[in-house]
């Protein structure tokens, strides 16, 4: 009978030190990859008013926003597959280069006669932003795949929770830099040009310094030293893992349910992020509304860290932790539905920050640590060329659901306005989305609470945190032998 064995000790001091060194490099590089993507994306958003003032039709700008969202969603499905089939670092670098080109073409169009050509202007800018969305889609799935190659399931929640702060760092950098450029009286085009160029330079640095896997860096791992032993005693190298197909990834246990659940959670996040400033303007001036709503974004940053850390404390029961976060969120949404008009400002600020944490935590952890856990399913026998595809499915499904769900919000507002209750129906809708998303994880929650042999897992009471991988049992050294 064929079996797998480990023929060398991988735990030498030199090997461990080298591994830890490269982990820091990978963490920092992929963090910067995603931060750069958000910096360039947000920089464009910050100067949309200037773009329209230069002559671009507001309808074209609106179409650019919608087009970006849909190509980003569709691109997530494709780029995840590319990251599993080719060098993920090269795919990420390609995304960074592509984003640079698209943004520079937008600046070029705004600096030449193109912007004054009524027949060609709309097509130029819309095409640039559609392609830009596809290139930006490399960020989530492929960077997550690289991280998954370097960080095991032990402590994964906290590590990925810290890692997901990248988007906020990028957004903050964009806000600070764009504000400085505009306040200093420089041309608004520099708000896009400078981050675009830095983005491209970082792509080259990333391409030549980041190894895809420990094996590429010359680090000995169990995988690199494993051999197959036949009944006759002959040894041969284990065949390299092959990328799994889209359908196979979609049919992995819990991928479908998490993809759908994430869609509802992301819809709640998008609604809060985009609608809060508008909702608050019925009680505050525009400037105050933006400041107050920013507390929601501030709360999202520690959300992923807290959610990941708590899920590690509870031995990887991420579905249970996510459900707890969502369970706390529902009564707060109900509170807003009924009493938002009378909530004191100080209490409102605290609640918004807390709600940002509750929404941001599950959203961030599902697309990182949970996706990595799902890609570790025993049915694909530790195939490390599945994570990009799995993350792409979850990311893409969430973006599509959120994009279509946004269409319901103005309709619900009009109904509420006609009935004299304002945004109350919108809040009810968000509560329904929260409950629906949590319900989709009910099977996973039950298995985490009541694990059994049929689920290929041992009871949690018999295992430590280092043994439980969240979605499969990790064999002990004795079992490996």
Locations of regions flagged by a protein language model:
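Cytoplasmic membrane-interface "Motif A"-like loop-to-helix N-cap segments
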Residues: 85-96, 312-327
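Glycine-rich segments within core transmembrane alpha-helices of 12-TM secondary carriers
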Residues: 157-176, 182-183, 299-300, 391-405
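Helix-loop-helix hairpin linking two adjacent transmembrane segments in secondary transporters
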Residues: 163-214
